[in-house]
């Protein structure tokens, strides 16, 4: 046999052996984690990850979590946040590394927020990396349209890539539920459609931030499927540390005047922003005598900025509008000129 051919043959065998070994190590890590909960969806992933972890922990489960939202964190066995310091750009490959790391502790459950946006990577993450026992798709909304498609149906189909085979799917999505039902049926997965109708005002009391009822409803449903009572799950969720990007209200005093600042920057699509606006309109501690809106724009998301400005003009109707970003001249005539109060613009530079 030619030396070059023989060397190539040995190299190929070595690569195959290495890949097989890596796959075996990963499968062994998964076997050490009997309950694997994978959280996907357009909005609420980080919050639901934290709520489920807290509900399980309250019931005595040993549980680890990982969020990838505003500020990626590990949620350790005691429920404390451990900041993730990345030395390179985030990639879905880190899910494998963290699953192996988590497997060393042999927890009863791991709750992972999905990192992938592009459809093919969502498939790889679920079907080859996580292999979840419980999948959660919070909702399907018009976001990341460049990667997932410009129609809600396209986005729902993309998100459905994280529906497992022979597992459980929990979702609060209503408009595109039929898509999830169809995909789940082909994969012999049971669908648990959840609404927030059963979440009362009393249930929402005790949280140290503004939480969405549908996030709580989803998290309760997952906990109940694992034998945890609704009351016990809620008790744990109220103790959960909110995500850095969670919806919160800060009371400020400036020059003898009182202001309330609502941090809603994590909601960067029109539907989610409108939902939050409707929530805070009903909040008893907020005075709507004078409303200011602050919009942070991105030069690579012109369509998104236009949609949010349209929503601000139509629904919020602020007395003042503050906009940060570059190349904002395109918004002046169609939007800024229609604001009833003053408009302040801030450059990124």
Question: Could you tell me what each predicted segment is?
Answer:
Residues 224-262, 267:
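Gly/charged, well-structured mid-domain segments that form the phosphate/adenylate-handling core
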Residues 175-176, 265-345:
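Active-site beta-alpha connecting loops in nucleotide-dependent enzymes
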Residues 27-33, 54-135, 139, 143-156:
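ATP-dependent carboxylate-amine ligase catalytic core
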Residues 129-139, 179, 208-242:
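A conserved, hydrophobic alpha-helical segment in the catalytic core
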Residues 134-167, 171-193, 273, 305:
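Conserved catalytic-core segment of NTP-binding enzymes
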Residues 61-64, 109, 191, 291, ...:
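Hydrophobic anchor at the start of a short beta-strand
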Residues 1-40, 47-51, 59:
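Short, basic phosphate-binding NTP loop
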Residues 52, 56-57, 184, 335:
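Hydrophobic alpha-helical packing residues
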């Amino acid at each position: 046999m030619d030396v070059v051919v023989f060397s190539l043959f040995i190299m190929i065998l070595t690569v195959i052996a290495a890949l097989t070994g890596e796959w075996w190590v990963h499968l062994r890590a998964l076997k050490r984690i009997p309950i694997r909960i994978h959280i996907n969806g357009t909005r609420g992933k980080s919050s639901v990850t934290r709520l489920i972890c807290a509900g399980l922990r309250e019931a005595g489960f040993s549980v680890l979590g990982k969020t990838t939202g505003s500020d990626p964190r590990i949620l350790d066995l005691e429920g404390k946040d451990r900041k993730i310091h990345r030395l390179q750009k985030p990639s879905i490959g880190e899910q494998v590394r963290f699953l192996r790391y988590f497997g060393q502790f042999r927890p009863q459950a791991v709750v992972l927020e999905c990192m992938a946006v592009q459809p093919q990577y969502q498939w790889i993450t679920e079907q080859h990396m996580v292999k979840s026992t419980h999948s959660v798709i919070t909702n399907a909304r018009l976001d990341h349209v460049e990667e997932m498609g410009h129609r809600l149906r396209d986005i729902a189909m993309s998100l459905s890539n994280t529906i497992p085979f022979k597992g459980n799917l929990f979702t609060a999505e209503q408009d595109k539920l039929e898509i999830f039902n169809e995909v789940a049926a082909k994969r012999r997965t049971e669908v648990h459609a959840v609404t927030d109708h059963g979440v009362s005002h009393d249930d929402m009391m005790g949280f140290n931030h503004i939480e969405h009822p549908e996030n709580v409803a989803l998290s309760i449903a997952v906990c109940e499927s694992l034998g945890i009572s609704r009351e016990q799950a809620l008790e744990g969720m109220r103790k959960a540390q909110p995500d850095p990007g969670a919806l919160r209200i800060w009371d400020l005093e400036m020059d003898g005047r009182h202001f309330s600042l609502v941090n809603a920057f994590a909601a960067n699509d029109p539907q989610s922003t409108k939902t939050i606006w409707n929530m805070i309109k009903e909040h008893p501690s907020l005075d709507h005598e004078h409303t200011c809106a602050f919009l942070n724009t991105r030069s690579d998301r012109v369509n998104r900025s236009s949609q949010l400005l349209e929503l601000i003009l139509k629904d919020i109707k602020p007395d003042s509008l503050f906009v940060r970003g570059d190349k904002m001249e395109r918004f002046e005539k169609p939007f800024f000129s229609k604001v009833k109060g003053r408009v302040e613009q801030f450059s990124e530079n």
